[in-house]
Amino acid sequence: MAVAGLLLLAFAFFAVGQAAATRNSAQTAADAAALAAGQKYRDQLSTELLDAIRTGAPWKDLLDGRGVPGTEACANAEWFAGRNDADATCTAGSYPTSFAVEADTRKTVGRSVIPGTENTHASARARAVVEPRCTPGPEPEPTPTPAPGEGDGPGQGDGDDQGDGGDQGDGGDPPTNNPPAGPPTVNLTCEDGKEWTVDPADPRDLPEAADLFSVRLAE
């Protein structure tokens, strides 16, 4: 009788271990999926931000971590959950930009001495937050526009009846037909003290997505 009791206790501990392992799998899947969503969104934000600066479109909301639909990010979360043998639902949130994921394991706990475990799946939740790491820096000094040359004025005609039209005055230097100014250079100041200068006319040495935004798991 004592041996049977010990066996039952051992099987119960085994069932608890199975459940814990399945629960850990669910949490791993949820964490990975949430981070995958945040990282996908961060990459999209970075691309959209630099494109907006290059074309002169509004960009400050993008620098704040907003302005890109979360559809692709959530699709990335669901794909990563599948890599961890789980199904996931993803919900995008704002202020701060975040992605909440609930993952359910595809495998069950398995058969054990505890009734019903063969049909029990584990669930877990995770949330990733995307936060800006940079703020707008000082605006560059505007380049002064040279004034066009001034003319000498029209000449006067002679004093006869009809009067000659006279020589026309020199119109001075013709106005300079400068091409329209392109989008302005943008300075960014980031958390690590790094200063970035994004020049639309010279798109080199640009910040990476990880320089502009951080992604972390949150409670």
Where are these regions (language model features)?
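Alpha-helical assembly-interface signal, strongest on the long, hydrophobic N-terminal helix that forms
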Residues: 1-68
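Functionally constrained cores in energy, signaling, and assembly domains
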Residues: 18, 103-107, 119-122
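Residue-level marker of positions within ordered structural domains that often coincide
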Residues: 35, 86, 131
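Short amphipathic secondary-structure patches
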Residues: 39-111
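Low-complexity, S/T/G/P-rich flexible repeat/linker segments used as non-globular hinges
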Residues: 112-219
